[in-house]
From Swiss-Prot:
This is DNA ligase. It comes from Borrelia turicatae (strain 91E135). Zn(2+) binds at residues 408, 411, 424, 429. SMART domains: BRCT, LIGANc. NAD(+) binds at residues 41-45, 90-91, 123, 146, 180, 293, 317. GO terms for molecular function: DNA ligase (NAD+) activity; metal ion binding. The active site is at residue 125. Its cofactor is Mg(2+); Mn(2+). Belongs to the NAD-dependent DNA ligase family. LigA subfamily. The gene is ligA. DNA ligase that catalyzes the formation of phosphodiester linkages between 5'-phosphoryl and 3'-hydroxyl groups in double-stranded DNA using NAD as a coenzyme and as the energy source for the reaction. It is essential for DNA replication and repair of damaged DNA. InterPro entries: BRCT_dom, BRCT_dom_sf, DNA_ligase, DNAligase_adenylation, DNAligase_N, NA-bd_OB-fold, NAD_DNA_ligase_OB, RuvA_2-like. It catalyses: NAD(+) + (deoxyribonucleotide)n-3'-hydroxyl + 5'-phospho-(deoxyribonucleotide)m = (deoxyribonucleotide)n+m + AMP + beta-nicotinamide D-nucleotide. The keyword Cytoplasm does not apply. Pfam families: BRCT (PF00533), DNA_ligase_aden (PF01653), DNA_ligase_OB (PF03120).
Amino acid sequence: MGRFNVKFMIKDIEDEILCLRDNIRKWNKEYYVDSSPSVSDLTYDKALLRLQDLESKYPEYKTLDSPTLKFGSDLLNNFEEVTHSFPILSLDKAYDIKELLLWIEKMVLEGSSLGSYTGISVEPKIDGCSIVLYYKDGILQKALTRGDGRVGNDVTENVRTIKNVPLSIDEKVELVLRGEIYITKENFLKINHTLKNPYLNARNLASGILRRINSREVASFPLDIFVYDILYSSFGLSTNHDAFDKLKKFGFKINPFCKFFGGKNLEEITNHVKKIEMQRNSLEYEIDGVVLKVDSFILRDILGYTSHHPKWSVAYKFESCTGVSKIVDIVVQVGRSGKITPVAHVEKVFVAGAFITNASLHNQDYIDSIGLNVGDVVAISRRGDVIPAVELVVEKLSIGSFKISSNCPSCKMALIKEGSHLFCVNKHCPYRIIEQIKYFCSKKCMNIVGLSGKTIEFLFEMKFISSEIELYTFNFDRLINLRGFDLKRIDNLKRSISDSKGRPFRKLLLGMGIKELGANTILVLINNNLNSFDIISTLCKNKEAALAKLLKIKGIGEKIALNIIEAFNDKIILDKFNFFKELGFKLEEYNTNYVVDDSFLFGKKFCITGSFEGHSRDVLIEKITKKGAIFNRAVTKRLDFLLVGEKPGLKLQKANNLGIKTFGLFDIKDFVDLDN
């Protein structure tokens, strides 16, 4: 009996990990790509922490495509994508004073034990659009959005129009700064009132203005900025408060609520946090919390980074503001995977700076837990000040709880329950097909520009297309007399669809929407010579042999392997691939040396010794640090590795004495582009 219990426990753990990954990937897409998150920051962060904890305890289930190794993206098609010189990370979070105190105590303790504690800086967390400013010889060279943390959109010309961004500074220095572009509450309401399609909140308006193509238009809007961090400077700085003093002298705008606490009195720090929270509604701009940072740059260097956030900083998130509204309808949505999501439509209500008209209800269990139905008056919050959420029933005006139908709202097939969620398993379900076509056309897959979600729904409902493949056979000239389809738009659509034929095999494979098969897992397959449709489909004909081979590949778990095998025995998917093959699509990936995960270097402290044929040491240092590693000039016990070339010096002997790992160029070639 005991054996069975252990087996079931392990199976439950594996299922929980897979479920968490599914949810987090979905939430990442909703937040960073669709701009319509369905869960709160708190729910997201708890899920991410739970996944990190499980992967730490059960490393055998950790895969290279885990969302714990990645973070989201705000990249757009309209602006050039540029690689950041340094990783632009997120922040660790605390949701109550107790968590915040524990973090402060930890920083004080670690800093004091190392003799490098100088204090804590506290500043408001501005709810705006993140920007990175690059100065060379004292002149603004470029301004990039955060993007996915490694690559951002170049919005330099638009940022130049913001009056509080210095175009040049008095000293010929190099600087890389982080800031937050925002628009005041008053200006948000004034401008939003004049727009045909108003924005949900001030942050979205600021982001929308910043991404306008015409810089003259941007200049006509009152965007503003607070600078809050130095990522790099060509002059020496030892503390955050020294850095802020220097930035003020250069003419940068620093938030007036930024305050430095040099002592170890925790009460002083938390009182200032509470003061900012109390004054939140009276501020002229939106904030959603405060950020605490270790003041000493030396201590920051010692504490280091995770792949997600610096260990020397934390964001304390304020509780969301709430409003009261009435539920006028509950609709049920069907996702690409068949997952059923109930959504509440509510009477328009202004909550935390934005008008709310709908909110996700997650699943039937959630609805039952608060006893919700159409007609009820409910409390609505913007969790994390972003996501609309129904918190509770304030006034019960209906009978009982809303019940999701046992049949799919689209195809009417009986739903099945997996965990807390209902699913439609009909592969021919119209709603599922529409969502799959949207995914196929998305930037991350086939990048068919101009085919919006509404356009795809229109084409499907008019029976012009019934799957992805019909995008390539449909005569788009038939749309020319329809409203919204002029000749220019149709030509652009045809060109974009034609261009998609040249997308690499890995993008086409991703676009098939195979469950659990994400971009990184596809690169794992390719790196293990499963790099073409013919190779994978031939392998999967023998299911047992395919499973055995796939499970030998690091980063491929049983569930992913079974999903791949099932997909490559699915007539619908095989027919699609064969269609694309006949159309001349690339069904083979010729480059089989993709870097799947460069987090190996991220946050690692390294030093360098010796000479390297064909490579200058300065260039090597630059390339490695661009991957998130931290360069140290001397070998110390805190070093993670020493890069060793020909004729190494005494640094090698010291590293060996301290037990520090030593690497050659061969050891890092998979993580750093040494050829360019």
